[in-house]
């Protein structure tokens, strides 16, 4: 059994015992998203958020699913809500910056990536994201600086 199937089986066992277990719904949603089952991921994130409308992790997880589906408006709305609940959530801040980058709002993307770096300077993927924006707008020296810093952190961050 691969690790996703094993994780899915575990979450299903928990949810069979308690279908209102928010962390298990969000966890299963992450597995669904990782395996490309976006509709199932959204259904589980939606249910988790129905049960706990203040769960910033579930809201940011749904936002990330929307981002991967190129549902930019929905992703931004969810990232905004997650950040409102947890203003120091570097993952949500960086995710929102990725959406801004995707829709060409580079100033907001740079501000978001910088804020995420300030919140957690150990996330190589955020440095690499800001580096990509710098590259896109022709600020090559700053891009190289961020890429170099990201490479230095890469061993500890598989998403870089």
Spans of features found by a protein language model:
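Conserved structural position within tetratricopeptide repeats
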Residues: 13-16, 47-50, 81-84, 115-118, ...
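Register position in tetratricopeptide repeats
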Residues: 34-35, 68, 102-103, 129, ...
């Amino acid at each position: 059994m691969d690790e996703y199937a094993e994780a899915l089986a575990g979450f299903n066992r928990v949810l069979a015992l308690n279908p209102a277990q928010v962390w298990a719904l969000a966890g299963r949603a992450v597995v669904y998203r990782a395996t490309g089952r976006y509709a199932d991921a959204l259904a589980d994130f939606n249910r988790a958020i129905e049960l706990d409308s203040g769960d910033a992790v579930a809201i940011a997880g749904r936002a990330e699913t929307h981002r991967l589906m190129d549902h930019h408006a929905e992703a931004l709305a969810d990232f905004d809500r997650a950040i409102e609940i947890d203003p120091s959530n570097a993952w949500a801040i960086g995710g929102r910056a990725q959406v801004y980058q995707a829709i060409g709002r580079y100033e907001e993307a740079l501000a978001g990536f910088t804020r995420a770096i300030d919140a957690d300077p150990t996330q190589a993927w955020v440095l690499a994201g800001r580096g990509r924006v710098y590259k896109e707008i022709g600020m090559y020296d700053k891009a190289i600086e961020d890429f170099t810093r990201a490479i230095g952190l890469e061993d500890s961050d598989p998403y870089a």
